[in-house]
């Protein structure tokens, strides 16, 4: 398998969005929702060529008549048939490539079950006949994209958040922490607090509207209590949003109450530590000699870190947890929504990486378990 003459494909399969493209590019060619939609009603118009399932943007645009399902929950694939549909759509409709002609780099969340990664490997080789593949840890790729080899990555996507400390290019597995609280939980929480305002959003299609409200209007308050006071005493924080049917709704303190759950998971009835505390705990699990380097390189990555104000708040919270003399730096690259993909693009085009691929021959010889030996 000679990686020089053929471009590798990089696919970052997120719980919410799938990012796909070619190694060496600076941005993914295709970004679409990781959704498979099936009609809620039976078709009556014969000859319209109705399909029994829709993927990605097409599912999103027809959401009014479909039931939408996400095959990846909390970073783990829960429905392999739908996952196969998403990959098929990625190769043939989005990238328009033959998977049997390109090595494929896939990504996954750290601390995923081993079976998840084996099944990914099996489908790539047996269903799509790829010549070679590799599975990389998402947070590690984000660090590559930021041009660092040491730092702690706080990666928060739609399905899962995790903190991964990396020193001189090595991830420290004993200190990786995972938090099953991410964008989708915030969307559900936003649905709940909007219901308290008298706006009802219940179906899977309406959840997508709420996700849009969250992405466009939500932000993280630097001081939550003070912000609540401001919201109560004036209408300066209120914003309006036009629903697809033209109805206009107003949202106020929901704008910052929603992402506040990242710092106070008790809002969602969860007992876990918030993202700031999880980052701190992760640093504390590392050797005392390297903590300073980690505090000075806290890299945010993933779509759920895109809320305005999140970096300042993270800085404030970590400063109060860390030793008083510690220099803390939060790195929030503007392209952090795609930094996992960008890191994958960098990794797959390195000449030193070419011997890391799992080839079809190796797979045929050892079976799916080879992935644990060849990929971190």
From Swiss-Prot:
SUPFAM superfamilies referenced in this protein's UniProt entry, alphabetically: Actin-like ATPase domain
> A Gene Ontology biological process annotation?
response to cAMP
Q: Which reaction does it catalyse?
A: ATP + H2O = ADP + phosphate + H(+)
Q: Which GO terms describe its cellular component?
A: actin cytoskeleton; cell cortex; cell leading edge; cell pole; cell-cell junction; cortical actin cytoskeleton; early phagosome; intranuclear rod
Q: So what EC number does this one have?
A: 3.6.4.-
EC category name: hydrolase
Q: Indicate the principal place this protein occupies in or around the cell.
A: cytoplasm
Keywords per UniProt: ATP-binding, Cytoplasm, Cytoskeleton, Hydrolase, Nucleotide-binding
Instruction: Supply one GO molecular-function term.
Output: ATP binding
UniProt subcellular location: Cytoplasm, Cytoskeleton
Report the record's disulfide bonds.
Answer: none
Query: Which Gene3D superfamilies does the protein's record reference?
Result: 3.30.420.40, Actin, Chain A, domain 4
Q: Which Pfam families match?
A: Actin
Q: According to its UniProt record, which protein family does this protein belong to?
A: Belongs to the actin family.
> What job does the chain carry out?
Actins are highly conserved proteins that are involved in various types of cell motility and are ubiquitously expressed in all eukaryotic cells. Multiple isoforms are involved in various cellular functions such as cytoskeleton structure, cell mobility, chromosome movement and muscle contraction.
Q: What is this protein called?
A: Putative actin-22
Question: From what organism does this protein derive?
Answer: Dictyostelium discoideum
Provide the gene name from the record.
act22
């Amino acid at each position: 398998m000679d990686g020089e003459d053929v471009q590798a494909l990089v696919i970052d399969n997120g719980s919410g969005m799938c990012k796909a493209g070619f190694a060496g590019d600076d941005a993914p060619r295709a970004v679409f929702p990781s959704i498979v939609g099936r009609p809620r009603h039976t078709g009556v118009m014969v000859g319209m060529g109705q399909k029994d399932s829709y993927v990605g943007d097409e599912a999103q645009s027809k959401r009014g008549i479909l039931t939408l399902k996400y095959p990846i929950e909390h970073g783990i694939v829960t429905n392999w048939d739908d996952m196969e549909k998403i990959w098929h759509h990625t190769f043939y409709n989005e990238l328009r490539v033959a998977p049997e002609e390109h090595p494929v780099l896939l990504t996954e969340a750290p601390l995923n079950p081993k079976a998840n990664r084996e099944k990914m490997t099996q489908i790539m080789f047996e269903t799509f006949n790829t010549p070679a593949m590799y599975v990389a840890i998402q947070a590690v790729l984000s660090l590559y994209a930021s041009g660092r080899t040491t730092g702690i990555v706080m990666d928060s996507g739609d399905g899962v958040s995790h903190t991964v400390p990396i020193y001189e290019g090595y991830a420290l597995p004993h200190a990786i922490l995972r938090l099953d609280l991410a964008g989708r939980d915030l969307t559900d929480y936003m649905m709940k607090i909007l219901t308290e305002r008298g706006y009802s959003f219940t179906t899977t299609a309406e959840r997508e509207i709420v996700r849009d409200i969250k992405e466009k209007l939500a932000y993280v308050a630097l001081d939550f209590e003070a912000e609540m006071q401001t919201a109560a005493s004036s209408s300066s924080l209120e914003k309006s949003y036009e629903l697809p049917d033209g109805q206009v709704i107003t949202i106020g303190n929901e704008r910052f109450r929603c992402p506040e759950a990242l710092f106070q998971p008790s809002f969602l009835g969860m007992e876990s530590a918030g993202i700031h505390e999880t980052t701190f705990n992760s640093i504390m699990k590392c050797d005392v000699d390297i903590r300073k380097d980690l505090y000075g390189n806290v890299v945010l990555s993933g779509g759920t870190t895109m809320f305005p104000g999140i970096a300042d708040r993270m800085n404030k919270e970590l400063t109060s947890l860390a030793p008083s003399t510690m220099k803390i730096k939060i790195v929030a690259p503007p392209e952090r929504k795609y930094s996992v993909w960008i890191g994958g693009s960098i990794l797959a085009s390195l000449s030193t990486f070419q011997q890391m691929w799992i080839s079809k021959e190796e797979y045929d010889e050892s079976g799916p378990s080879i992935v644990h030996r060849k990929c971190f």
